[in-house]
């Protein structure tokens, strides 16, 4: 077994609420400097900056996962993670069919920049990314897991778009294995208040949208097996394998 530090929820300049300077290479570099072993890029309802993130992460010696912070029909955020960019892109193709396409108003919401590993802008998403899809909680979970990914509720300890904030409690279904916390200090108080969380394992995501939101030092670690890359071991851990 080995100890790995993780941060499995981060945004880039593709999310309109993310700072333009949050290019994938910077996200990767900041996590490497912080001592994180495995980091995931999880922009709102898209995975299109994951290739640049993977290229930069591998250059820096960071082990990456590809992901998406999907907004369900209930307006709840769930994190969907994949081992490869190709799997994540295939998932996004399916999610796109469930997006509600509203033109992005850059002057109000911000830019949605697709960039390469050299920080060059290669495109933009013209439609506002964070709004709710037509996928329900269960449909999003079923889609992600059927395509080889994992899915868990994002920032259950946050008042905005969190599972508990929206529903008032943790539902029986989907049968999530993990719950993501934004602040590890909230884990025990939330488990005390919401009994179903006691049956779920905990994972951490900084939900960083700007450089100074990435912790300067890694704050959350897990024990995983010794096989393969750190990202591969973390992914097996998330899948319960």
Positions of the model-derived regions?
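Charged catalytic cores and adjacent phosphate/nucleic-acid-binding surfaces used
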Residues: 1-8, 12-30, 34-36, 47-90, ...
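Conserved Rossmann-like nucleotide-binding pocket used by diverse enzymes
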Residues: 40
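Active-site gating loops and adjacent loop-to-helix segments of metal-dependent hydrolytic enzymes
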Residues: 83-125, 168-169
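Alpha-helix-centered segments that form part of catalytic cores
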Residues: 111-146
């Amino acid at each position: 077994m080995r100890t790995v530090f993780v941060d499995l929820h981060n945004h880039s300049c593709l999310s309109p609420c993310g700072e333009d300077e949050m290019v994938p290479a910077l996200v990767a570099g900041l996590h490497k400097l912080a001592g994180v072993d495995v980091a995931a890029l999880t922009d709102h309802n898209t995975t299109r900056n994951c290739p640049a993130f993977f290229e930069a992460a591998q250059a820096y010696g960071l082990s990456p996962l590809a992901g998406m912070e999907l907004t369900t029909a209930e307006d709840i955020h769930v994190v969907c993670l994949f081992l490869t960019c190709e799997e994540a892109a295939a998932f996004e193709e399916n999610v796109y069919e469930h997006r509600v396409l509203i033109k992005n108003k850059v002057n109000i919401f911000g830019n949605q920049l697709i960039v390469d590993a050299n920080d060059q802008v290669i495109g933009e998403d013209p439609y506002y990314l964070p709004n709710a899809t037509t996928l329900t909680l269960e449909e999003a979970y079923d889609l992600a897991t059927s395509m080889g990914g994992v899915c868990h509720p994002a920032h259950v300890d946050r008042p905005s778009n969190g599972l508990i904030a929206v529903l008032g409690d943790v539902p029986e279904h989907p049968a999530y294995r993990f719950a993501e916390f934004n602040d590890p200090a909230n884990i025990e108080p939330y488990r005390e208040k919401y009994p179903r969380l006691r049956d779920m394992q905990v994972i951490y995501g900084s939900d960083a949208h700007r450089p100074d939101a990435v912790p300067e030092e890694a704050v959350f670690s897990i024990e995983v097996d010794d096989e393969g890359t750190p990202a591969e071991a973390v992914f097996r851990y998330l899948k319960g394998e």
